[in-house]
Amino acid sequence: RIYVSQNAGTVQASNKTYIMSSYSGSITEMYISEGSYVNEGDLVAHIKSTDIDMQQDNLESQLKIYQTQLDQYNKLLQCVQDDTNYFSETNPEDQPYYYQYETYKSQVSQKTFDATAYQAAGYSDAQIKTMMEQSQSEVEALYYSTMQSISQSITSAQSNVDNVQAQLDALNTGANDYYIYAPT
């Protein structure tokens, strides 16, 4: 014989948990339906965070600017070392560096000693030699101060690149937070 009993009641899970994301955004994919049974660690949903995406885009733009700046300063350093202007006067990105190098070269030419005028004026060879040595010393001081200034700019630009890259890496490391998993 079979006995059938009908009773009214509600079945509840022994563990009920509410899940929230640490980022705001819109749910792009749901891997389960509401009320489904899940196991610990199951993937529940994917969230697209517009705030983080905008922050990442902004950081990538900054990184590009700082990297270009770093490249330009390295090129300027090479210009001074090679005594050649590798920048284009017509390229808007090159112009500040082109003119920076040209200013340096103008200062060098102002400090360069021309003995012919002094010889014609009757200066002695000893006086001319002293003036030439002083002029050479000033040109060397200008060279080293320019190299030091450019090197400091390179260090600063590299620091900016490293800082923004670290922020991007930290942002990308948190990419797992875009996914919601069942609590463990």
Predicted regions and their residues:
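Long, charged alpha-helical "stalk" segments
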Residues: 28-179, 183
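N-terminal beta-strand block that forms a small beta-sandwich/beta-barrel module immediately after a flexible targeting
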Residues: 1-24, 28-31, 180
